[in-house]
C-alpha cells in the first residue's frame, strides 16, 4: 500500500491479489506465517507473529480433522485407491490428542526416523535457506528469551529474522524428535530413512509397512 498507483487500484477493487497455493508450492502460506524480527528486514513484530502462529496452529488442526473427508473424496470423486497424508513437521507441536485419534483410526501413521547424516543435511539446508517455522508458544518464549540475552538485544525489532531462524532451527529440530517418537509409539509405527531409500515401488512400500508393524508388536 506504499505505492499510490497500486493502492488506488486495490482500494477501488480494480485489481486483486490471489495466492497461487498448490501441493508443490506452499510459499504463499509460509510467507504469511513469516519470521520474527526487524520489519526492515522482512520480520514481524512479536504480537503479530504470535497471532499468525496461532492461526497456523488452528489451521493445521482443522486440516487434520478433515482427513477422513479428504479420504472419502479421494476415493469417491477421483477414484484414488490410496491416500497419503504428508503432514508437516509441526504436527508434533500441536498438542491436540484428538487429531491423533482420528488419524490413527483412518490412516497408518509412519514416523520416518532420520539417520545422523540425514539430520545434519536437514539442519544444513535450514541454515542455508531459512524458512518460516511454527513453534509451540512455550518453546518460542523460552528460546526467544535465550536469544535476546545471548545477543544482548533489548528489542525484538532488532532481531535479524533469518539469523534467528538459523539459530533456533537445530534446537527446534532436536526438541521435536522425542515428540515424533512418542506419537509413533502410541499411535503409529517407525521406519528409518535408510529403509525408505530402498523402496522402489508399491510392493516395497507395503512390505516395509508390514515390517514396521511386525517390529512393533514383536
Labelled PLM ranges:
Residues 46, 112-116, 197:
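Short loop/turn segments at strand-loop or loop-helix junctions that form parts
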Amino acid at each position: 500500500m506504499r505505492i499510490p498507483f497500486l493502492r488506488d487500484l486495490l482500494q477501488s477493487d480494480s485489481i486483486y491479489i490471489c495466492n497461487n497455493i498448490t501441493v508443490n508450492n506452499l510459499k504463499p502460506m509460509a510467507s504469511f506465517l513469516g519470521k520474527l524480527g526487524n520489519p526492515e528486514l522482512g520480520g514481524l513484530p512479536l504480537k503479530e507473529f504470535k497471532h499468525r502462529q496461532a492461526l497456523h496452529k488452528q489451521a493445521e488442526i482443522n486440516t487434520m480433522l478433515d482427513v477422513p473427508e479428504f479420504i472419502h473424496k479421494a476415493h469417491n470423486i477421483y477414484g484414488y485407491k490410496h491416500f497419503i497424508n504428508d503432514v508437516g513437521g509441526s504436527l508434533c507441536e500441536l498438542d491436540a490428542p484428538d487429531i491423533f485419534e482420528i488419524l490413527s483410526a483412518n490412516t497408518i501413521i509412519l514416523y520416518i526416523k532420520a539417520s545422523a547424516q540425514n539430520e545434519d543435511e536437514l539442519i544444513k539446508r535450514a541454515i542455508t535457506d531459512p524458512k518460516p517455522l511454527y513453534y509451540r508458544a512455550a518453546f518460542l518464549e523460552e528460546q526467544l528469551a535465550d536469544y535476546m540475552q545471548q545477543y544482548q538485544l533489548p528489542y525484538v525489532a532488532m532481531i535479524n529474522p533469518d539469523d534467528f531462524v538459523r539459530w533456533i532451527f537445530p534446537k527446534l529440530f532436536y526438541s521435536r524428535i522425542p515428540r515424533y517418537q512418542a506419537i509413533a509409539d502410541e499411535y503409529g509405527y517407525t521406519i528409518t530413512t535408510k529403509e525408505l531409500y530402498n523402496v522402489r515401488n508399491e510392493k516395497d512400500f507395503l512390505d516395509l509397512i508390514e515390517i514396521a508393524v511386525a517390529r512393533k508388536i514383536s
